[in-house]
Design a protein with these regions (language model features):
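Interhelical loop and helix-boundary elements at the membrane-water interface
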Residues: 1-14, 50-69, 117-137, 177-193, ...
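Hydrophobic alpha-helical transmembrane segments of polytopic
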Residues: 9-12, 32-39, 105-112, 138, ...
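Helical transmembrane-bundle signal
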Residues: 13, 17-20, 75-78, 109, ...
Length: 233
């Protein structure tokens, strides 16, 4: 029975993604973001359970990618599409229809996520580190943007800025930038300095900014990875 636990958790990830899409259809952007975050938790737990129970299977790997595509590819893409579409109705740049194409920038996230997951499945070197931004991290960043409202109001409510984020995040997904994986094989300081440092930064940001810290945590993850790579040369 225990061998089915990782796949069960993966299915929970998938269900969260589907519920998030349903929430978007009903016009509930914030609840849909919560479903993305819940999917992130299940995505972490299924991998953790598989390593803890020493379970690995081709079906589990494929199921994980399919679930991730829904929760961290399709859902954030539709989330950006609906958000930018809604903002265009209340901004001056929508007057002549010149920027009517902006919402479709969100769909780049789905395409880039599919490519990212396909590359990851074929690349056996991505165990202790990742090449490009992981899809869960990207989805978490995208759907947490509204919580930056109090800090960067004009930025959060700019359709053009959000479209640019779609393009940049899509490029990061398919980039070959080395980013550390948050996978603990043990809990020794010497083997996990960067992971413990990142967790400390994340806790501090959450304590200060609360939910607004989530996009900042993803940015710090990228910055910390780049910093370690730079100073390790």
């Amino acid at each position: 029975m225990h061998r089915h636990i990782p796949n069960f958790l993966t299915c929970c990830n998938l269900v969260c993604g589907c519920l998030g899409i349903v929430a978007l259809i009903e016009g509930k952007e914030i609840p849909s973001a919560y479903f993305v975050w819940a999917a992130c938790i299940f995505d972490f737990l299924d991998g953790f359970a598989a390593r803890l129970l020493k379970i690995s299977s081709p079906i589990g790997k494929e199921l994980d990618s399919l679930a991730d595509m829904v929760s961290f590819g399709v859902l954030p893409a539709l989330w950006m599409y609906t958000t930018i579409s809604a903002l265009l109705k209340y901004t001056i740049i929508s007057v002549d229809g010149t920027f009517a194409f902006l919402p479709y920038a969100g769909l780049l996230i789905a395409v880039a996520s599919a490519l990212r997951l396909a590359i990851f499945n074929l690349d056996e070197t991505q165990s202790d580190s990742f090449k490009g931004l992981p899809t869960p991290a990207n989805a978490l960043f995208i759907t947490a943007i509204p919580f930056l409202d109090a800090l960067f109001f004009d930025f959060v409510h700019s359709p053009l800025a959000l479209a640019i984020i779609c393009v940049v995040s899509s490029l990061l997904l398919v980039s070959r930038i080395d980013l550390f994986a948050l996978k603990f094989k043990n809990f020794s300081w010497s083997d996990n300095k960067i992971r413990f440092t990142f967790l400390l930064i994340a806790v501090l940001l959450l304590a200060v900014f609360r939910l607004a810290a989530l996009p900042l945590i993803i940015l710090s993850y990228i910055a910390l990875s780049l910093g370690v790579r730079m100073f390790s040369k």
